[in-house]
Amino acid sequence: MPAIALVGAQWGDEGKGKATDLVGDRVDYVVRYQGGNNAGHTVVIGDQEYALHLLPSGILTPGVIPVIANGVVIDPAVLFEELDALTARGVDVSRLLISANAHLIMPYHRALDKVSERFLGKGRIGTTGRGIGPTYADKTARAGVRVQDMFDPKILRKKLELALNDKNQILTKVYNRRALEVDRILDEYLGYAEKIRPYVVDTSLVLNRALDEGKTVFLEGSQGTLLDIDHGTYPFVTSSSPTAGGACSGSGIGPTRITKVIGILKAYTTRVGSGPFPTELEDEWGEWLRSRGHEYGTTTGRNRRCGWFDAPIARYATRINGITDFFLTKLDVLSGLERIPVCVAYDIDGVRHDEIPMTQTEFHHATPIYEYLDGWNEDISQARSFDDLPKNAQAYVRAIEEMSGAPISAIGVGPGREQTLELRPLV
């Protein structure tokens, strides 16, 4: 059976948790393959809302095996906080599997992330301050601490001593902060070791064997394509690869095993943090979208920047990921608009660009070129088929589909599990 990748097609917060929840009972494994607790998934089941930051959304579906794979960076304190919270609400968390090769977020990563962002002032990137970037930096520099290192106190102490020789110099001499102690961190993480041990396996081996046995593996990305370290709006990006390519390296599954790539698109556009955003609305319409769509970060609580749908970005995501199907979310938010602007291209210094420009300088100066589609007044939150939608809502979906370069196979018309129109099977 296939592996299926789920990717955000914008700047994150597109509704990936809703998509995972929709297909959760049709798959056998749900895998987080990158990022950490710097992103949030919100899943609504009946009258219960669950906000997950690190755990795969599939942990909420009985019988599904949730996996935190090698490409994820783990803050053990956050991990056990989420596990304990779900256990208290009656969720079985014993099925969770964690890669021995996943890297750990250490106290010095969080400390450096926070002070360096403040030090940058107006040049800040907009990090969540949770240590994600410094952890990936150490991973790339071959100086990171992995889950498996917690099981050998000698190796863990040696790695901590080497790390703090460097990190404490930066904390004390550059940022005038207090030095961190090896023994205190060692004791804390050795305590985590015994709690995490029952979950730790070779996740790549488990997932590939599952595929060999005909099981379905669902690879759940966090953030979005435009936040990818290689393909995003650099440097205003995350430190990992939330694209379909990242799903392979972050899970240990080969590219030929992924047979479908589902891109999640919001019916408008949002972004958290700094960086270019051509369709951003800094007026009453931006506040209208924010209020209607409840656009506040699951992880940070920060206001999301809001704007109209950006077709060049959607086409870019299709190209970068090889998207085969789109899931369009939050269509219901647009109800009540007489006309809906859609960005179809950019004007840069008087020249039309139908695709995302090559340089960030050009992207910063891009002005959206809009086409206007007729809106609708009806409440569509009770729609249960495409034919239930008003004609203008149907036309909006078809226009977005044509502009984005891949079929829209599902539509979200509200936050609930049942508020989804599946035009063709996603799994």
UniProtKB/Swiss-Prot annotation:
Molecular function GO terms recorded: adenylosuccinate synthase activity; GTP binding; magnesium ion binding
Q: What is its EC number?
A: 6.3.4.4
- Tell me where it mainly resides: cytoplasm
Positions binding GTP in this chain are: 12-18, 40-42, 304, 330-332, 412-414
Family membership: Belongs to the adenylosuccinate synthetase family.
The coenzyme or cofactor needed here is:
Mg(2+)
Gene Ontology biological process? 'de novo' AMP biosynthetic process; IMP metabolic process
What does the entry list as the binding residues for IMP? 13-16, 38-41, 128, 142, 223, 238, 302
Family matches, as InterPro entries:
Adenylosuccin_syn_GTP-bd, Adenylosuccin_syn_Lys_AS, Adenylosuccinate_synth_dom1, Adenylosuccinate_synth_dom2, Adenylosuccinate_synth_dom3, Adenylosuccinate_synthetase, P-loop_NTPase
Q: How is the cofactor bound?
A: Binds 1 Mg(2+) ion per subunit.
Q: Where in the cell is it found?
A: Cytoplasm
- Which catalysed reactions does the entry list for this protein? IMP + L-aspartate + GTP = N(6)-(1,2-dicarboxyethyl)-AMP + GDP + phosphate + 2 H(+)
Q: What is this protein called?
A: Adenylosuccinate synthetase
Q: Which domain of life is it from?
A: Bacteria
- Residues of the active site are 13 (proton acceptor), 41 (proton donor)
Q: Which UniProt keywords apply?
A: Cytoplasm, GTP-binding, Ligase, Magnesium, Metal-binding, Nucleotide-binding, Purine biosynthesis
Q: How does it assemble?
A: Homodimer.
Instruction: Briefly state the protein's biological role.
Output: Plays an important role in the de novo pathway of purine nucleotide biosynthesis. Catalyzes the first committed step in the biosynthesis of AMP from IMP.
Q: Which GO terms describe its cellular component?
A: cytoplasm
HAMAP family the UniProt entry points to: Adenylosucc_synth
Q: Which residues bind substrate?
A: 298-304
**Residues binding Mg(2+), per UniProt:** 13, 40
Q: In which pathway does it act?
A: Purine metabolism; AMP biosynthesis via de novo pathway; AMP from IMP: step 1/2
List, alphabetically, the CDD domains matched.
AdSS
